[in-house]
UniProtKB/Swiss-Prot annotation:
Keywords: Cytoplasm, Queuosine biosynthesis, S-adenosyl-L-methionine, Transferase. HAMAP family: QueA. It is found in: Cytoplasm. This is S-adenosylmethionine:tRNA ribosyltransferase-isomerase. It comes from the Bacteria. Pathway: tRNA modification; tRNA-queuosine biosynthesis. Transfers and isomerizes the ribose moiety from AdoMet to the 7-aminomethyl group of 7-deazaguanine (preQ1-tRNA) to give epoxyqueuosine (oQ-tRNA). One of its GO terms (molecular function) is S-adenosylmethionine:tRNA ribosyltransferase-isomerase activity. PANTHER family: S-ADENOSYLMETHIONINE:TRNA RIBOSYLTRANSFERASE-ISOMERASE. It holds the Pfam family Queuosine_synth.
Amino acid sequence: MRVTDFSFELPDELIARYPMPERTSSRLLSLEGNSGKLGDNQFTDILDMVNPGDLMVFNNTRVIPARLFGQKETGGKLEILVERMLDDKRILAHVRSSKSPKVNTKVCLDGGYEMTMLARHDALFELELNDEKTILEVLEKVGHMPLPPYIDRPDEDADKERYQTVYNDAPGAVAAPTAGLHFDDALLNRLKEKGVDTAFVTLHVGAGTFQPVKVDDVLDHKMHSEWAEVSQEVVDKIAHTKAHGGRVIAVGTTSVRSLESAAKASEDELQPFCRDTDIFIYPGYEFKVVDAMVTNFHLPESTLIMLLSAFAGFDEVKNAYQHAIAQKYRFFSYGDAMFVTKKAN
């Protein structure tokens, strides 16, 4: 398959640059994988799409204020985007400056904090904080929320709350698991009252999620890796749900990738998973765990629209996106969502 097969024209005004006033006031496009049937809904209508005994799996990662500004020893300005925290003092990061900092040179951050450039690993830089504080403490103090490039505006105070799920619990992501942004505490309670169970996985979304696919053939793409965890508790809940005829509904592509990574690593029955994953899901992939998913609208030619096409069918997804554009749905991280059921192989 060609990467260009997943292209589409999106009017600029459909890119959501701010969230809706209320988390649940987004629209929800439903897509039935088997029939291709579409439905225009409000997000709270998700209550009518789930059944007692279903299990909804959320990604509980917390977005860290991963963008730092500072200058090199030479005085040149630079911007650091944390890709992942290696420990309390060291990070792997993308560095943007006129010239890359050299190994063993110092970087002075806003707020007077200092870092040393330890090594370069391909496109990423390894830096160490020279301070008694931890990296996380410094990020919380002087870091900026790492809004995606297509939002195309500086971060604002409101983003610290809204570019974050209400159930975030595990700091480490540099991008939000955006399907989860539509849920507030009241909706989560209503799902529980309906008899829908919930479970939480962790996948720390990396900046690689915004990297364009740079090859012509889908099969040639090398996926970035991200750290994921699926606990024994989640495994047990999935087994119970499947045994009683319920569906596993993944909230977001990161939850899908976490669960399918665990399944891929398990020989027979699903096992807990706790390590890096570079799973790349594209048409032809057979899903082993997930029956339905909630997801936002994705970028053209992205690995995420490839994942969705694998799940609900290439033609079905193409048609759904054409419908969404015609009906002026809001796209990307702060945009509207879809509720999608799996197409049988």
